[in-house]
Amino acid sequence: MTTTGSWHGLHLFLHSATGDTDAFLLREVAPRLDALVGAGQSTGWFFIRYGQDGPHLRIRARDLDAAGAARLADELARAAKEVPAVPGPWPSAHGEVRTVPYVPETDRYGGPRALPVAEEAFGASTRVVLGALAEPHGAAGAARLTVAADLAHATAYALGMDELSAARWLRRHAAGWRWVTEVPLLPGAAVHARVNSVYAAQRTALARRAAHLREGLATGTAAPWPSRWADAVRAADARLRGGAAGTDGSGADGGGAGLSEGVSAWVWASQLHMLFNRLGVSPDEERAVCRLAARTLLETADEEEPPSFFPAARTAADVQYLERSKFQIGRGQDTALRPTAPARRTAGPAARPDLPLPAAPLPRVPLAGVLAGRSSARGPLSGPLDAQGLGALLWHALAESGRSAQRLADGSVRTAVHRPYPSAGALYTARVRLLVLATDGVPAGTYDCVPESRTLRPVGPVPPLEEVKALSTYLSRPATDPDWIGIDDAPVVLGVYADLGLLRGRYGLRALRLALLETGHLTQTLLLTAAALGLAGTPLGGFHDDLAHELLGLDDLDQPLQYLLPLGRRAVDADRAGVSPGGPGAGGGPRGGAV
């Protein structure tokens, strides 16, 4: 671990409500620490809120000597006793102070050369939060979340993100909580439902506030706390991204950290989280604020006309898309293809190694039998399914199936790699994200399927079954409903998605149409392969999109999910005898499936 100066750490346990903790910070903590800095006894300080062993403040003071630290601890302990306490099953005492060494999360903030800048940002974040809390309305009630949203917008703006980039970044940050296991969180469905209800009620006001803030940051007329935070972020990011070393050539001042754009965005997501923490925003509130801010940034509808899911005007999004994505005869230059961009990997912690997945051979069954046997399965799905069976399903449907030689006009030969389904430009941008629930020989988890190497790439833990069921009403209906699909004992759930970011770079607006076609081709191939293996399922094209992308770890704009495909073995084939192929709800929307 690397840091600058000598930091002294105090853990002050304050078993109090958030508002009382705010008041204590303003009345007792900040004046004392600022006085130490003003007297030259410390060169800076910051704090965070924490819950381990009981609610407490972690206070870090730089270059504070032992005597000064002891006096500070004693004064804060006495002052804390006067703050109202709330009962709780914690092993700490209200007002207790512990001296605990400060151990920075160096890698999380960009490495040793970037850490000094991170620590300065912690101090700037502390000052901004205290200033916002000291305002006449403070952060009481919903005002706290309004301040948080403003600071989220200000962070993205200061990093040079336009509205689309900012929305993507904020959504990624909110979705990242899906992989956190150390903190108890609300189910994703609860957070998304709250975001959607607030957005529906306040869409216009939220959009106006965000636009006004961005304009104010551009002209220097924004409110003081978002403005000061944006200035601090802009200056710090310039140092983090700069390639020149510090004045002594060591980078000790944080200059020359040379962080890439992707790593910088990842680092600033951590800084945004700590800003919310200091403000007293809970993780679930943080998820909601970031999602709400992101949705606001993508708003383009007329403020006076509420959005409709069934628009009839010429301005309807689907009408405009179909018109603008056409290949126009005589105007080939407008739709000329572009070179394919290289695939990008998301910055972040090192991933676990890929998991090799063997594949059993396909059984020798007649095509007519497979075609006749492929139909959507209602009722409970179950195993058994083992690793070789899963490999057979995935790689016989997804992976390379053959090669051929193509002689070109100049006489050279090009080798074409084939898979069992067609793909625009042979880019194979239809992909599969996999939830392994109960498959022998494969650890439960969330995986990305890598057909090129016939491996599973670990993405994270598998979500709780109840959260998977919340993705579609087909999965959450009572077992007595004839259209219920039971996944309590299902071995796997597949998510078929498109790498639209890659496809769009080559085909522009045509890419979405091509992606929809390819994911349909792949899904049918998966279903036929499943039928040959004695498996069945229902491809669900209607699901709760934002929640599904979050649970599967997909970027909803660059990696749009097209189908959820729970697979397993039918419990009793006879139960299907009376099911109509066009049963209730066979259309789209969260209640729509496919037959």
State each model region's role:
Residues 1-337, 357, 370, 374:
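An acidic, charge-biased composition feature
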Residues 534:
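Structured binding elements
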Residues 509-518:
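Short pre-catalytic strand/loop immediately N-terminal to key active-site residues, enriched for Gly-Thr
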Residues 73-76, 408, 510:
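"Short basic amphipathic alpha-helical interaction patches in structured regions
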Residues 248, 256, 264-506, 519, ...:
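N-terminal accessory segments that position/regulate proteins before the catalytic core
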